[in-house]
Amino acid sequence: MLKKKNIFFKKKILIYGLGKSGLSAYQCLNKKSKLYLFDDKKNFIKNKDIKKKLITYKQIKDEEFDYIIISPGININKCILSKYLKKNSNKINTDLDIFYSLYSRNKNITVTGTNGKSTTVKILYDLLKNQKFDVRLVGNIGNPILL
């Protein structure tokens, strides 16, 4: 895959949500940007390096971030950081935004919607794979997009 300079490099970034998507964003940007991490369930985090980068709600309010990467499972209307995220909505991005900024020159197919995504993606994957295209399944049906 072709890579280009990423707009997320050399920035101050808050990653909110440390499930699969959040951790993959952390791994992708860890040595390229100054990262701050926040998760509602920080007691479950075992990794020492990640624990060191965890910040509190108060610290978040005192910082100015270039970007906020939020995990797909976070409902910005009902989460702990709801008011903060709404106030800073122009800074919110996802792992998909990071991926597309890295690989914008590549041909990508993205399937979104409520019903039928997995079936559609599996059919497309099989069709393209049979034609010898370099294809990968990511997201709900495979690995996080950044891994």
PLM features per residue range, with description:
Residues 1-94:
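N-terminal leader/targeting and accessory segments in enzymes
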